[in-house]
Each structure stands twice: as structure tokens, then as C-alpha cells.
């Protein structure tokens, strides 16, 4: 799979030529000598743009720990993470949106005529992470899709209501069509990588027990408490 269906000349990170409703894009060989160019995202590609340096490193830690088959470009402020979007679970672009895992990012999809700057100011962006030859890129993990509402997991520490916040977050994830297992995986990722002071495994098991999901599917955010389990 190629993440790009072609390339275009850019100027100050803006396209210097038309690219919508077009199929005759330049090849990589035709743009490599330029000081600046971009790749037009393929229809089955999605780009997670994390401009905050600290948050980009957190997401990179998750990618490395899970050994995800994706591509990661270093940018001037953060990182770009590219995945497949074959299932079409992301249908539009987002700006400064909350991801399921508790981070904030911009999202670009090839379905909406999006592009990614690959060379700027005479320097090609470094590919920090990529698949091995013969491997396939992964579909975008569910914990990277946008969710409504925000919980400041990044700033939480001991005594700030982490347990109840994670428990409440189950409803947010279920409202975004996360399955039970997808929600469990997401909350475990938040606990391990996003919280400054993670809960121990026994506390997490209480939050993620089966009864929590049964109650949340029939209750409301205001009426259900972790203490009720």
C-alpha cells in the first residue's frame, strides 16, 4: 500500500497547484529536487497529526510498545502517524479533536482531498517508524478515533479522581460505538501511558469488570458511580 496517490509542489506548506478532482499527480521522482512538496493522501489513508511535542512522544511510546504497523514522520512541532482507513471508520477531517486515548490531534483523510507536507525548507521529513518489508499497514486503532467530550487525563495524578474519571469514560467510549473489548483496551492504554501516576492492576480490574459495562449501558453519567459496583 502507498499512503499517497501522487505528489504536488507546495509553498509555505500550501499547495502551489490544484489537486482536487485531479488524477495526474506528479511522481516522487518529479518532486524530490524541489525545496518543498506534499503527498496527496490515498483514499484508504488516514493521518493523525499530533502537533504537541509531549503528546506526540506519548503516542510514539504506545506505537513502539504495541509494535504497530504504521508510518511515523517527524515534523517541526510533533509527529504524523499514518494508518490504513479501509473500513472508512473516519469519513472526514478533524481539527484539534479529542482522541479515544486521551490525546488531542488533527486528523486528515484521503477521502477528503487531504495532503501531507513531506519536504519543507529543503529538508525531507524523517521517517521515524515504518513497517518491515513484506508486512501490511494496520487499520487505524479504535482508540485513535475521535470522541465527544474531554477528560484531562494528562493532568491527573493521585487523589484527583482518576478511578471515577476512568469509570465515567466508559460511557463516552460506548457512545462512540466502542465495543467492550475496545473500551477496555483504550482505558488500559490511558492508564499505562497517559496518566502520570497509573492505577495498579487491581484498581483497574474493578473499573473494567463486566458489571461496569452492563450498568453503563443502561444508566447515565450522573446516576452511576464506581462505588455502586
Model-assigned labels for residue ranges:
Residues 38-41, 147, 177-180, 194-197, ...:
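Short secondary-structure junctions and interdomain/linker hinges
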Residues 65, 174, 190-193:
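Conserved short hydrophobic interaction patches
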Residues 12, 126, 149, 163, ...:
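Positively charged, low-complexity intrinsically disordered regions
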Residues 41-55, 60, 84-186:
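DNA replication initiation modules
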Residues 1-77, 84-87, 157-158, 178-184:
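Signature for HUH/AEP ssDNA processing cores
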Residues 184-229:
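Basic, alpha-helical nucleic-acid-binding regions used in initiation and control of genome expression
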Amino acid at each position: 500500500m502507498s499512503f499517497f496517490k501522487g505528489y504536488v509542489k507546495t509553498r509555505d506548506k500550501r499547495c502551489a497547484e490544484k489537486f482536487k478532482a485531479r488524477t495526474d499527480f506528479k511522481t516522487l521522482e518529479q518532486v524530490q529536487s524541489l525545496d518543498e512538496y506534499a503527498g496527496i493522501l490515498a483514499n484508504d489513508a488516514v493521518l493523525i497529526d499530533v502537533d504537541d511535542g509531549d503528546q506526540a512522544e506519548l503516542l510514539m511510546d504506545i506505537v513502539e510498545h504495541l509494535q504497530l504497523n504504521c508510518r511515523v514522520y517527524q515534523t517541526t512541532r510533533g509527529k504524523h502517524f499514518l494508518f490504513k482507513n479501509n473500513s472508512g471508520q473516519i469519513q472526514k477531517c478533524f481539527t484539534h479533536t479529542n482522541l479515544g486515548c486521551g490525546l488531542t490531534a488533527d486528523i486528515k483523510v484521503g477521502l477528503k482531498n487531504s495532503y501531507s507536507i513531506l519536504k519543507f525548507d529543503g529538508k525531507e521529513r524523517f521517517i521515524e517508524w515504518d513497517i518491515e518489508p513484506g508486512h501490511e499497514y494496520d487499520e487505524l486503532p479504535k482508540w485513535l478515533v475521535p470522541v465527544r467530550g474531554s477528560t484531562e487525563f494528562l493532568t491527573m495524578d493521585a487523589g484527583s479522581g482518576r478511578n471515577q474519571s476512568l469509570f465515567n469514560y466508559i460511557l463516552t467510549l460506548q457512545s462512540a460505538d466502542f465495543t467492550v473489548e475496545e473500551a477496555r483496551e483504550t482505558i488500559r492504554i490511558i492508564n499505562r501511558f497517559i496518566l502520570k501516576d497509573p492505577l495498579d492492576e487491581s484498581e483497574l480490574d474493578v473499573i473494567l469488570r463486566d458489571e461496569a459495562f452492563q450498568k453503563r449501558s443502561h444508566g447515565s453519567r450522573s446516576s452511576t458511580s464506581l462505588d455502586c459496583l
